[in-house]
Amino acid sequence: MQSITPPLIAVIGSDGSGKSTVCEHLITVVEKYGAAERVHLGKQAGNVGRAVTKLPLMGKSLHKTIERNQVKTAKKLPGPVPALVITAFVARRLLRFRHMLACRRRGLIVLTDRYPQDQIPGAYDGTVFPPNVEGGRFVSWLASQERKAFHWMASHKPDLVIKLNVDLEVACARKPDHKRESLARKIAITPQLTFGGAQLVDIDANQPLEQVLVDAEKAITDFMTARGYH
């Protein structure tokens, strides 16, 4: 018997694992089972600095401020200006998440590129503000709002999470413009994420793309069949 609630399927992995390419293929697979929507739920934290740089008058100055605060975040919260920029991106992500929930309420099968998590603060797809550090009252309040937002989003557990696991050398070769240290952290974190006990499928993303797509498609097919879709 087909499940009443449309499935929520997430694809996660480090940069260089091929998430976007896999999602582009999988949405065509998912659509065979019914009306579906692909939604990007990534925080896109790397875009914060690039977006700020484009702002008129103060863009470059703010970008430098954010970079300085990123180095200091282990010891204290950022200042008000970068904190507001971070909060604006959290609000943007919340809008996308609410759109995803609306799609489910409309009866659509949802495939997400990335998924928010509150399991590991500071990790990818998690909170930006560091926990349990000193800061001004206003920025501390913004940090608490971010934690609440991520806790709420993470409380909506996906039905299936496809993890694309990739080695550091492969990721670096695919993303030569990314910092090696950053990629290494993301790769190390991926196996630790459990998404509240969601069903997980691990895929070796070091393989040629064609085989990765075959494995991902099989994961979808097996899952949808078990949910009563044919």
Swiss-Prot record:
Keyword Nucleotide-binding carried by entry: yes
One GO cellular component term: cytoplasm
Keyword Transmembrane among record annotations: no
Positions of ATP binding: G13, S14, D15, G16, S17, G18, K19, S20
GO function term, MF aspect, one: ATP binding
GO biological process: dTDP biosynthetic process; dTTP biosynthetic process; dUDP biosynthetic process
InterPro entries referenced in this protein's UniProt entry, alphabetically: P-loop_NTPase
UniProt KW keywords: ATP-binding, Nucleotide-binding
Domain of life assignment: Bacteria
Entry-linked PANTHER family: THYMIDYLATE KINASE (PTHR10344), UMP-CMP KINASE 2, MITOCHONDRIAL (PTHR10344:SF4)
Protein family membership: To E.coli YghR and YghS.
Name this polypeptide is given: Uncharacterized ATP-binding protein YghT
Organism: Escherichia coli (strain K12)
Protein's gene: yghT
